[in-house]
């Protein structure tokens, strides 16, 4: 080794830089005292000589050295790199195993945690049969009615009750229902004509002072007003005055729109009936300049506006022309006011005529009790729906009200009540035969 190193040592000592470092080496600083092994390691460290080949088992030694330098987090696979001064994540499975130990398996699907598998999927212990695969039989027993469980030993099985179909599930033909109603109405006429028939609970005998003197005057006044031709619309004005430009379906749509307007501003109950009366009476005497949706809506909205003024005592919100113009998307409030002046002139300033809602309240003014009040409310609703029927213009408002009351009684069918009674005939002045055709007209609009 000395013979090999001597030429290199001589060259290095001749170099000025190396000569200045001789004093840093162990010994007296002379070449004779220099440790050749130390110099060899130094030369190989600075790259002057090639590195020694790796000895057998060097990997294990390097791994042991790295493991010895690991930080406190080496149990989590985090090692400390002394060169970069940072922690390096090294999976423990990638480190070489100690001598005499097999290498660790690479993690895969088979190494997933066992908690993800239900216990019944694990193999059974030795000597035990495997658990059955879950299915319908493993559903909780509370989902099955008790009658489906097997009976105890010695007891016969419980009989399964027959499935009862609900009554409302069967569809009812409207024609059959109307025919049944008319038959019951005819039967009530025969029943009321029987002199031996007992008087119902709501008969005139149970109501003292039913026909007081002022009641007769009020009734006579209402009857005269409803027959006044100046306060009634023409039953065929769509053809005779408007020339067929407005259909019955278009009129029904406008009436429904007027109903939404009255509900939007919570107007009084009689506002809609009075507004529809103004609408029909105006179109019965004035042909429109145009039949656009804007023009028809303007007439309908103005009728509601005028009726709301008449029924202002029962109105929550006071309407003005600006509200009507905003709801109907008209040009301005002046357009509504101009139509109002034209409508008032066409109506002859006669705004207080009776309508069907007026007569429903008049005929049921003595109603008392829960069932009779229900009949009264439903009769008012039926009268509201009858406004959409163009055919109802051919009947007096009192007859439409009587038909609505009969339909309400038949629909609710209170105990002991018939579609028509002798008391109702006395109050309204109509027999069941008188209102039969009006009932059919009203039912066709429901």
Swiss-Prot record:
Keyword Cell cycle among record annotations: yes
Gene Ontology cellular component annotations, sorted alphabetically: cyclin-dependent protein kinase holoenzyme complex; cytoplasm; nucleus
Organism: Oryza sativa subsp. japonica
SUPFAM superfamilies listed in its UniProt record: Cyclin-like
Family listed: Belongs to the cyclin family. Cyclin F subfamily.
Region described as Disordered: spans on this chain: 191-216
Record PROSITE patterns: CYCLINS (PS00292)
Gene encoding the protein: CYCF2-2
A molecular-function term among this protein's GO annotations: cyclin-dependent protein serine/threonine kinase regulator activity
Protein known as: Cyclin-F2-2
